[in-house]
Amino acid sequence: MCSRRGLLPVYAVLVSLWFFAAASTGCARLPYTTSVVHEDRRVIVSLQRDPDAVPYTHPVQLNADELSAVLAGFSFREKQRLPLRWFAEEVPPKKLLRSDEMEAVVPFLVEGLAKAAPDERVYFQVLAPGMNPAAERDTTAGWIAVREPFLHVVLEHYHAQFPIRKSEQWDLRYPATPPEPKTYLLYFEPGRFWETDPTTKRQAVQFREFLKTAIPASRQ
């Protein structure tokens, strides 16, 4: 009986160390910001290091017309479970970005792709006043990256309401915790350029081939 009691503290220490190691490993593998490309009241574009990513072919040279043409082909639906998925499929997918949002963010995405390292992705936030402008900010956010010949786009938030004042994060009455990222199903038109990247098994757009048909050679 005494020996069992003596082992209890040892087990407790081992379990604590296991949880600490697991938590430390999980945190270390999260993407983190390495530099801010641009920040104003309308858009924030930054570079994030992605420890788990297969190296991208960054830096990449694209102009604003080219990237705008590619992003204009994207639409999405929020991923739903059954039976909500049946109803969601009846609604046409939404465009990834409106034209005014594209004009605001694309120049800085182009700059980000030109500066990104192979282990970095370009993260963006498009901002607007929230439902309660004094406390919230409307945020559409995601990231883009290039692994030739594919351009990857991930949407994490779509017009989500983000708290403005970070100082209230631990106020239980008015928590300022940002919403969790959602999962979205992305589509691209024309569909023949929407393929699976064999390196990651994720869908992406064959953007070089698409641009040959979307933009005249004189403008490329």
Model segments located where?
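Sec-dependent bacterial lipoprotein signal peptides
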Residues: 1-25
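Bacterial Sec signal peptide processing site at the extreme N-terminus
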Residues: 19-45
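Early exported N-terminus immediately downstream of N-terminal targeting peptides
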Residues: 47-103
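A mature extracytoplasmic/lumenal domain signature
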Residues: 49, 126-130, 140, 150, ...
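Sec/Tat-exported extracytoplasmic proteins
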Residues: 71-78, 109-120, 155
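Mid-length scaffold segments of soluble, non-membrane domains
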Residues: 98, 102-138, 142-148
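Envelope-exposed proteins and targeting segments
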Residues: 120, 138-142, 147-151, 168-170, ...
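Polybasic, proline/glycine-rich intrinsically disordered low-complexity segments
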Residues: 158-219
